[in-house]
């Protein structure tokens, strides 16, 4: 049978990231292209223990349908985790458990963009965001990066343009692909511009927990008093990516639209994975686990920088 693929999907390109990952199975190749977390950082024993306990003691809790927002007790555990150092989730914010952060990017575009609308993105930006936004018909407006984050004058020019963007997508902590971290001053300025021009910020934070040097910089969401910031947090780098678990924190009015998008997409996130994550958050010392992950990456980073300095002294890179 000949299938007539829709115009929208014919214009979409396969995920570059997935194509890169295919090459990583080649035993003759050492690839630095994919962002696979270190396998020795996965808490496999804890996951196995909690999974076995759950399936033996309360299998229905893991195997039955659940609400689209996420299991209520899981959402409370995630809210507490997100708020343990700074106030990410406030009274007017909802928490949605999603099937990875990619789903949050997809929902933001679906809920905020019409065909032909503009989305502002850092330039360069995370490749995985491109298809998520373009699948909803969005056009991308790139904003150049500087060493301390996005160029503010360029960002304001995009915000002030006749075709005002529907939102601004950024990764303030260890930006993908540059590795740069947005300064506190620029985060405050980005938030001020967002409020002034009425452009929401989609703050993607998959790497914030992995800081191996220096002090954490407050998230843009922690500054949010107007419901202007959509925060995407992920468990892929601090638990494991195969569980496909992330969480979105945003104003409850927008969250209602995200929940409908969730119902149309996959009904709800894997309940077993949610329950195991809840056990990890409430019954283990997650901060101690994250400290061990940082040690793993600190050693890898030190070796990588040593080799770059020795073998590629002409190369400039983000430390």
Language-model segments: residues:
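N-terminal small-domain helix-loop-helix segment of the aminotransferase-like
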Residues: 8-100, 107, 282, 302
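Short, solvent-exposed loop/turn segments at secondary-structure junctions
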Residues: 35-39, 102, 126, 173-175, ...
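Inter-domain helical "communication" segments and dimerization helices
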Residues: 58-59, 282-286, 308-317
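Conserved core of the PLP fold type I
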Residues: 61-198, 202, 208-226, 297
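Conserved core segment of the aminotransferase class I/II
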Residues: 225-295, 307
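Conserved glycine-rich beta-strand-loop-beta hairpin in the small C-terminal domain of fold type I
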Residues: 278, 295-305, 314-319
């Amino acid at each position: 049978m000949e299938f007539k693929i829709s115009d929208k999907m014919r214009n979409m390109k396969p995920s570059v990231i997935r194509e890169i990952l295919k090459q990583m199975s080649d035993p003759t190749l050492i690839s630095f292209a994919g962002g696979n977390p270190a396998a020795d950082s996965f808490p496999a024993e804890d996951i196995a223990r909690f999974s076995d306990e759950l399936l033996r003691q309360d299998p229905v809790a893991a195997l039955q349908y659940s609400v689209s927002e996420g299991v209520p007790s899981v959402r409370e555990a995630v809210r507490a985790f997100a708020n343990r150092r700074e106030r990410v989730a406030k009274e007017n914010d909802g928490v949605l458990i999603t099937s990875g952060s990619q789903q949050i990017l997809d929902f933001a575009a679906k809920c905020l963009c019409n065909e032909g609308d503009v989305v502002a993105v850092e330039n360069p930006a995370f490749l995985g965001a491109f298809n998520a936004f373009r699948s909803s018909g969005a056009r991308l407006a790139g904003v150049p990066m500087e060493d301390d984050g996005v160029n503010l004058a360029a960002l304001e020019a995009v915000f002030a343009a006749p075709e005002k963007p529907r939102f601004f997508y950024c990764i303030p902590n260890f930006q993908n692909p540059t590795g740069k971290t947005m300064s506190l001053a620029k985060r405050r300025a980005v938030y001020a511009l967002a409020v002034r021009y009425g452009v929401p910020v989609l703050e993607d934070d998959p790497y914030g927990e992995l800081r191996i040097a220096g002090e954490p910089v407050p998230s843009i969401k922690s500054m949010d008093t107007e419901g202007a910031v959509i925060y995407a947090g992920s468990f892929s780098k601090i638990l494991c990516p195969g569980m496909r678990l992330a969480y979105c924190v945003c104003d409850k009015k927008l969250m209602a639209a995200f929940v409908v998008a969730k119902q149309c997409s996959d009904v709800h996130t894997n309940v077993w994975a949610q329950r195991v994550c809840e056990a990890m958050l409430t019954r283990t010392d997650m901060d101690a686990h994250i400290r061990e992950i940082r040690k793993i990456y600190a050693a890898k980073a030190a070796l990588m920088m040593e080799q770059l300095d020795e073998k590629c002294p002409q190369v400039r890179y983000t430390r």
